[in-house]
A protein has these predicted regions:
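Carbohydrate-recognition beta-sandwich/jelly-roll modules
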Residues: 1-70, 101-103, 107-111
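Aromatic- and carboxylate-enriched substrate-binding clefts and catalytic-loop regions
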Residues: 68-220
Length: 220
């Protein structure tokens, strides 16, 4: 990361043990929050090309061996197109995502979807997001300006309708930690006026905050 500032404040946390150092660091930043207990459990991800039946078969193997699974992650093959993303279920692999998700929840298994923030031209969001996006593409996908309320609303409404309303419990946000050659250059522009460099350095946190605040927390 780069900070355009004439000075730098350095804060050092010390303690008698690593635990004490981490405790002081957490308290300095407000104390943190305890995630749901299932979030601290055992996570497993399946292959990107798996369909619903293959996911269930793999989870049954764990069950037969008395190995508890708390969360299963679906790599981006659950979507019609990725990466960039449509955020829409690939119906050949997951013909009935609502039933699939409910069956997992009945077994105490949460569903976590892998995605990145960039919009595929095949997505039904593409046209609406086009004027709300940056000047450069990432892998031919739009880079929405998620500082804009309208862009946030478009994505979170779609996520609620297609994912959260049927029981999806979370997301693995991918490909938000790159540099100028991997994502977009410093001279990229965004509708909000945020610079390309500042947007790139904060994009992952912006996406996380949006999904938590505008989606999970807002809709309980």
């Amino acid at each position: 990361a780069q900070v355009n500032s004439p000075g730098l404040e350095l804060i050092v946390f010390s303690g008698n043990s690593i635990l004490e150092v981490v405790q002081r660091y957490n308290l300095f930043h407000g104390g943190g929050a305890l995630p749901p207990l299932w979030g601290l459990g055992f996570w497993h991800r399946v292959h990107a090309t798996f369909n619903a039946d293959q996911v269930k078969e793999e989870l049954e193997d764990f069950e037969e061996r008395n190995f508890p699974i708390d969360v299963v992650g679906l790599e981006p093959g659950w979507m019609t197109k990725s990466y960039p993303c449509t955020f829409e279920w690939q119906k050949k692999r997951f013909p009935d995502p609502a039933t699939f998700t409910r069956e997992l929840l009945d077994k105490g298994i949460r569903l976590n979807l892998w995605e990145n923030p960039y919009i595929s031209k095949s997505s039904r969001l593409y046209e609406s997001m086009y004027p709300l996006s940056g000047s450069h593409l990432v892998w031919l996908g739009l880079v929405p300006d998620y500082t804009l309320p309208q862009a946030r609303r478009l994505l979170t409404d779609q996520h609620h309708e297609d994912h959260i309303s049927i029981g999806v419990s979370g997301y693995k946000i991918d490909e938000v930690d790159g540099y100028d050659f991997w994502l977009w250059p410093d001279h990229a522009t965004f509708p909000s006026g945020v610079s390309g460099e500042a947007m790139r350095q904060s994009y992952g946190l912006l996406m996380q905050n949006m999904l938590y605040t505008d989606l999970f927390k807002k809709r309980n």
